[in-house]
Amino acid sequence: MRHRKSGRHLNRTSSHRKAMFKNMAASLFEHEVIKTTLPKAKELRRVAEPLITLAKVDSVANRRLAFARTRSKDAVGKLFSELGPRYQARPGGYVRILKCGFRSGDNAPMAYVELVDRPVAEAAE
């Protein structure tokens, strides 16, 4: 029985899941919007939101914790220089998940994962 067990296995080993979410979190922080399957998006939110909360207080210890969880210097740099200050007044809910239909190959539900309050480029006319 799996009562009270949190998290999805996503048909992967634990090491594969950890590596996948490290990479996905780093990509999310770098691009601020990524497209993935809906179950992965919902699990990514559980990884990304605590990292942004960590980035609100810029310290060497917090930077090391963030680097241990993403293994990306660029992601950590952006996290503490841009994203932490941007969400200073927000008490959580930094990630938005938007459903975007189904993948053509296997009909998997797809979703965009984006950071809220991200600067959107103006559409060129």
Swiss-Prot record:
Family matches, as Pfam families: Ribosomal_L17
Transport among keywords: no
InterPro entries: Ribosomal_bL17, Ribosomal_bL17_CS, Ribosomal_bL17_sf
GO biological process annotation, one example: translation
MF annotations from Gene Ontology: structural constituent of ribosome
GO terms for cellular component: cytosolic large ribosomal subunit
Keywords from the UniProt entry: Ribonucleoprotein, Ribosomal protein
Highest taxon listed in the record's lineage: Bacteria
Family: Belongs to the bacterial ribosomal protein bL17 family.
Subunit structure: Part of the 50S ribosomal subunit. Contacts protein L32.
Record-linked HAMAP family: Ribosomal_bL17
Listed name of the protein: Large ribosomal subunit protein bL17
Organism: Marinomonas sp. (strain MWYL1)
